[in-house]
Amino acid sequence: MAKKHSKRYQELLKKIDKDVYNLKEAAEKVKELKSAKFDETVELALKLGVDPRHADQMIRGSVVLPHGTGKTVKVAVLAKGAKADEAKEAGADIVGEEEVLEMIQNGNLDFDILIATPDMMGKLGRFGKILGPKGLMPNPKTGTVTMDVAQAVKNAKAGQVNFRVDKKGNMHVGIGKASFDAEKIYENAVAFIEKINKMKPASAKGRYIQNAALSLTMSPSVKLDVNELTEYK
Protein backbone atom coordinates (compact mmCIF):
# COMPACT_ATOMS: atom_id res chain seq x y z
CA MET A 1 0.00 0.00 0.00
CA ALA A 2 1.34 3.46 -0.91
CA LYS A 3 2.54 5.52 2.01
CA LYS A 4 0.15 8.35 2.85
CA HIS A 5 2.03 11.55 3.54
CA SER A 6 0.85 14.20 5.98
CA LYS A 7 -0.75 17.46 4.88
CA ARG A 8 2.42 19.29 5.93
CA TYR A 9 4.53 17.00 3.72
CA GLN A 10 2.13 17.49 0.78
CA GLU A 11 2.48 21.27 1.15
CA LEU A 12 6.27 20.97 1.08
CA LEU A 13 6.08 18.82 -2.06
CA LYS A 14 4.35 21.71 -3.86
CA LYS A 15 7.45 23.85 -3.32
CA ILE A 16 9.57 21.42 -5.36
CA ASP A 17 8.66 22.75 -8.80
CA LYS A 18 11.29 21.05 -10.97
CA ASP A 19 12.23 17.43 -11.65
CA VAL A 20 15.95 18.09 -11.10
CA TYR A 21 17.97 20.96 -9.66
CA ASN A 22 21.58 21.96 -9.96
CA LEU A 23 23.44 21.83 -6.65
CA LYS A 24 23.36 25.57 -5.97
CA GLU A 25 19.59 25.76 -6.58
CA ALA A 26 19.02 22.66 -4.45
CA ALA A 27 20.93 24.19 -1.52
CA GLU A 28 18.57 27.19 -1.67
CA LYS A 29 15.48 25.03 -2.18
CA VAL A 30 16.03 22.77 0.87
CA LYS A 31 16.05 25.86 3.09
CA GLU A 32 12.50 26.58 1.87
CA LEU A 33 11.45 23.11 3.06
CA LYS A 34 12.14 23.71 6.75
CA SER A 35 9.05 22.82 8.76
CA ALA A 36 10.16 21.13 12.00
CA LYS A 37 10.55 22.89 15.35
CA PHE A 38 14.14 21.64 15.66
CA ASP A 39 17.17 22.50 13.50
CA GLU A 40 16.86 19.79 10.85
CA THR A 41 19.90 18.07 9.35
CA VAL A 42 20.63 18.62 5.66
CA GLU A 43 21.05 15.14 4.19
CA LEU A 44 22.77 14.19 0.96
CA ALA A 45 21.79 10.83 -0.53
CA LEU A 46 23.76 9.19 -3.33
CA LYS A 47 23.30 6.01 -5.35
CA LEU A 48 26.64 4.92 -6.80
CA GLY A 49 27.24 2.52 -9.67
CA VAL A 50 29.53 0.26 -7.66
CA ASP A 51 29.35 -3.31 -6.39
CA PRO A 52 30.69 -3.24 -2.81
CA ARG A 53 31.03 -7.04 -2.85
CA HIS A 54 34.25 -6.35 -4.77
CA ALA A 55 36.85 -4.97 -2.35
CA ASP A 56 38.08 -2.39 -4.86
CA GLN A 57 34.54 -0.99 -5.20
CA MET A 58 33.88 -0.52 -1.47
CA ILE A 59 33.67 3.28 -1.24
CA ARG A 60 34.61 4.20 2.30
CA GLY A 61 36.45 7.14 3.78
CA SER A 62 36.14 10.50 5.45
CA VAL A 63 36.11 14.17 4.54
CA VAL A 64 36.33 17.31 6.68
CA LEU A 65 33.53 19.64 5.57
CA PRO A 66 34.60 23.30 5.22
CA HIS A 67 31.74 24.52 7.43
CA GLY A 68 31.39 21.49 9.70
CA THR A 69 28.16 19.58 10.22
CA GLY A 70 26.56 21.89 12.78
CA LYS A 71 26.57 19.00 15.23
CA THR A 72 28.55 18.91 18.46
CA VAL A 73 30.68 15.79 18.11
CA LYS A 74 31.67 13.73 21.15
CA VAL A 75 35.03 12.03 20.57
CA ALA A 76 36.43 9.01 22.44
CA VAL A 77 40.08 7.99 22.06
CA LEU A 78 41.48 4.58 22.94
CA ALA A 79 45.14 5.27 23.69
CA LYS A 80 47.66 5.23 26.51
CA GLY A 81 50.67 7.23 27.71
CA ALA A 82 51.84 10.15 25.59
CA LYS A 83 49.19 9.47 22.92
CA ALA A 84 46.42 9.72 25.53
CA ASP A 85 47.88 13.06 26.65
CA GLU A 86 47.96 14.33 23.05
CA ALA A 87 44.31 13.35 22.59
CA LYS A 88 43.26 15.19 25.77
CA GLU A 89 45.15 18.30 24.70
CA ALA A 90 43.47 18.21 21.29
CA GLY A 91 40.03 18.28 22.97
CA ALA A 92 38.90 14.64 23.07
CA ASP A 93 35.94 14.10 25.43
CA ILE A 94 36.79 10.59 26.66
CA VAL A 95 40.37 9.28 26.71
CA GLY A 96 41.98 6.17 28.13
CA GLU A 97 42.48 2.45 27.78
CA GLU A 98 40.64 0.48 30.48
CA GLU A 99 38.02 3.21 30.93
CA VAL A 100 37.10 3.28 27.23
CA LEU A 101 37.14 -0.54 26.87
CA GLU A 102 34.89 -0.86 29.92
CA MET A 103 32.42 1.65 28.47
CA ILE A 104 32.21 -0.33 25.23
CA GLN A 105 31.86 -3.65 27.04
CA ASN A 106 28.93 -2.23 29.02
CA GLY A 107 27.29 -0.97 25.82
CA ASN A 108 27.75 2.63 26.97
CA LEU A 109 28.48 4.16 23.56
CA ASP A 110 28.16 7.77 24.68
CA PHE A 111 30.30 9.14 21.83
CA ASP A 112 29.96 9.86 18.11
CA ILE A 113 33.46 8.90 16.93
CA LEU A 114 35.97 6.42 18.33
CA ILE A 115 39.66 6.92 17.50
CA ALA A 116 42.33 4.34 18.37
CA THR A 117 46.09 4.01 18.05
CA PRO A 118 47.11 0.94 15.96
CA ASP A 119 48.45 -0.93 19.02
CA MET A 120 44.96 -0.82 20.58
CA MET A 121 43.09 -2.43 17.68
CA GLY A 122 43.74 -5.97 18.96
CA LYS A 123 41.73 -5.10 22.07
CA LEU A 124 38.77 -3.87 20.02
CA GLY A 125 38.33 -6.99 17.85
CA ARG A 126 36.00 -8.71 20.33
CA PHE A 127 33.70 -5.67 20.30
CA GLY A 128 33.01 -5.83 16.55
CA LYS A 129 29.36 -6.79 17.11
CA ILE A 130 28.85 -3.81 19.42
CA LEU A 131 30.75 -1.15 17.44
CA GLY A 132 30.22 -2.39 13.85
CA PRO A 133 26.44 -1.89 13.54
CA LYS A 134 26.78 1.65 14.96
CA GLY A 135 29.57 2.53 12.50
CA LEU A 136 31.92 3.21 15.41
CA MET A 137 34.69 0.67 14.74
CA PRO A 138 37.90 2.64 14.05
CA ASN A 139 39.28 2.17 10.54
CA PRO A 140 42.44 3.46 8.81
CA LYS A 141 40.34 4.51 5.78
CA THR A 142 38.44 7.02 7.89
CA GLY A 143 41.56 8.21 9.68
CA THR A 144 40.33 6.83 13.00
CA VAL A 145 43.16 4.30 13.40
CA THR A 146 46.23 6.51 13.63
CA MET A 147 49.25 7.51 15.66
CA ASP A 148 48.40 11.16 14.97
CA VAL A 149 45.53 11.16 17.46
CA ALA A 150 45.66 14.94 17.94
CA GLN A 151 44.94 15.60 14.25
CA ALA A 152 42.23 12.93 14.19
CA VAL A 153 40.51 14.57 17.17
CA LYS A 154 40.75 18.02 15.54
CA ASN A 155 39.29 16.66 12.28
CA ALA A 156 36.40 15.02 14.15
CA LYS A 157 35.65 18.22 16.05
CA ALA A 158 35.93 20.32 12.88
CA GLY A 159 33.17 18.35 11.16
CA GLN A 160 34.71 15.23 9.68
CA VAL A 161 32.11 13.04 8.00
CA ASN A 162 32.80 9.30 7.80
CA PHE A 163 31.01 7.51 4.98
CA ARG A 164 30.60 4.12 3.33
CA VAL A 165 28.28 2.67 0.72
CA ASP A 166 25.81 0.01 1.77
CA LYS A 167 25.61 -3.31 -0.11
CA LYS A 168 23.36 -1.74 -2.76
CA GLY A 169 25.66 1.23 -3.41
CA ASN A 170 23.61 3.77 -1.43
CA MET A 171 25.07 6.40 0.85
CA HIS A 172 23.44 8.93 3.21
CA VAL A 173 25.38 11.68 4.99
CA GLY A 174 24.54 14.76 7.05
CA ILE A 175 26.27 17.79 5.53
CA GLY A 176 24.91 20.62 7.67
CA LYS A 177 21.85 22.08 9.32
CA ALA A 178 18.77 23.90 8.01
CA SER A 179 20.03 26.99 9.87
CA PHE A 180 23.15 27.13 7.62
CA ASP A 181 22.96 29.66 4.82
CA ALA A 182 22.58 28.17 1.33
CA GLU A 183 26.19 28.97 0.36
CA LYS A 184 27.56 26.90 3.27
CA ILE A 185 25.27 23.97 2.42
CA TYR A 186 26.44 24.20 -1.20
CA GLU A 187 30.15 24.35 -0.29
CA ASN A 188 29.85 21.40 2.10
CA ALA A 189 28.05 19.38 -0.59
CA VAL A 190 30.74 20.25 -3.16
CA ALA A 191 33.53 19.14 -0.77
CA PHE A 192 31.77 15.82 -0.21
CA ILE A 193 31.01 15.15 -3.89
CA GLU A 194 34.56 16.06 -4.95
CA LYS A 195 35.85 13.46 -2.49
CA ILE A 196 33.44 10.81 -3.82
CA ASN A 197 34.42 11.55 -7.44
CA LYS A 198 38.11 11.20 -6.59
CA MET A 199 37.38 7.72 -5.19
CA LYS A 200 35.75 6.36 -8.35
CA PRO A 201 37.10 2.80 -8.80
CA ALA A 202 38.78 2.05 -12.15
CA SER A 203 36.73 -1.17 -12.31
CA ALA A 204 33.32 0.56 -11.90
CA LYS A 205 31.24 0.22 -15.07
CA GLY A 206 28.73 2.73 -16.45
CA ARG A 207 27.53 5.86 -14.69
CA TYR A 208 29.22 6.40 -11.31
CA ILE A 209 26.77 8.77 -9.59
CA GLN A 210 23.41 7.33 -10.65
CA ASN A 211 21.04 9.25 -8.40
CA ALA A 212 21.45 12.06 -5.89
CA ALA A 213 19.17 14.15 -3.71
CA LEU A 214 19.25 16.75 -0.95
CA SER A 215 16.66 16.83 1.82
CA LEU A 216 16.03 17.89 5.40
CA THR A 217 15.27 15.42 8.19
CA MET A 218 11.50 15.94 7.81
CA SER A 219 11.25 17.06 4.17
CA PRO A 220 10.74 15.51 0.74
CA SER A 221 13.87 15.11 -1.42
CA VAL A 222 15.15 17.61 -3.97
CA LYS A 223 16.56 15.59 -6.87
CA LEU A 224 19.99 16.66 -8.13
CA ASP A 225 21.32 16.83 -11.69
CA VAL A 226 23.81 13.93 -11.70
CA ASN A 227 25.48 15.19 -14.89
CA GLU A 228 26.51 18.36 -13.05
CA LEU A 229 27.78 16.38 -10.05
CA THR A 230 30.30 14.46 -12.16
CA GLU A 231 31.99 17.79 -12.97
CA TYR A 232 33.03 18.41 -9.34
CA LYS A 233 36.55 17.02 -9.22
Swiss-Prot record:
Disulphide bond pairs: none
Assembly and binders: Part of the 50S ribosomal subunit.
NCBIfam families linked: rplA_bact
**Which example biological process does GO assign this protein?**
translation
Q: Name one GO molecular function term.
A: structural constituent of ribosome
Q: Which organism is this entry from?
A: Nautilia profundicola (strain ATCC BAA-1463 / DSM 18972 / AmH)
Keyword field: Repressor, Ribonucleoprotein, Ribosomal protein, RNA-binding, rRNA-binding, Translation regulation, tRNA-binding
What this protein is called in its record is Large ribosomal subunit protein uL1
Function per UniProt: Binds directly to 23S rRNA. The L1 stalk is quite mobile in the ribosome, and is involved in E site tRNA release.
**Which HAMAP family does this UniProt record tie to the protein?**
Ribosomal_uL1_B (MF_01318_B)
Q: Which family does it belong to?
A: Belongs to the universal ribosomal protein uL1 family.
Q: Which GO terms describe its cellular component?
A: cytosolic large ribosomal subunit
Q: Supply the source organism's classification.
A: Bacteria, Pseudomonadati, Campylobacterota, Epsilonproteobacteria, Nautiliales
- Gene (name only): rplA
